[in-house]
């Protein structure tokens, strides 16, 4: 079994009226089979509205299948007890990187991931320092994230 695997994957978005009542559905994914071995690089291509983003959101359990099954590292994305493990195994980079900037300064941005994994604060600061040193940005750790700093942030992202 691959790192990412889907069998007969189906996903439908609900259509709702003004009061929020379900009045129908739109099938965005219809019977997709995919098997991606660990370490592979895969491009998912298609025109607007073809289901690329919907499929990607299944790969880290942001969405769960309406039908069929999606596994990430052997874990079924429909199992609520596996969500934490799945999301540690598979991340997502959004189309516009600025939409995923969390911190206001570089060191906050670098420390965001380990903080969400429950890494102790002292260890986070050590990792932040080591990471910024590794990419030659230690002296810019308190740089505010603005459009002027975008080129520097590309080193961090």
What spans do the regions from the language model cover?
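Conserved small/polar residues in nucleotide/adenosyl-binding loops
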Residues: 145-151
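Helix-to-loop junction immediately C-terminal to a conserved catalytic motif
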Residues: 60
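Conserved ABC ATPase "signature" region
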Residues: 6, 122-140
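Conserved ABC transporter NBD signature motif
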Residues: 68-78, 86
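Short helical segment in ABC ATPase nucleotide-binding domains corresponding to the A-loop/adjacent helical element
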Residues: 98, 104-115, 125, 129
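The feature captures the beta-strand-to-loop junction immediately N-terminal to the Walker
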Residues: 45-47
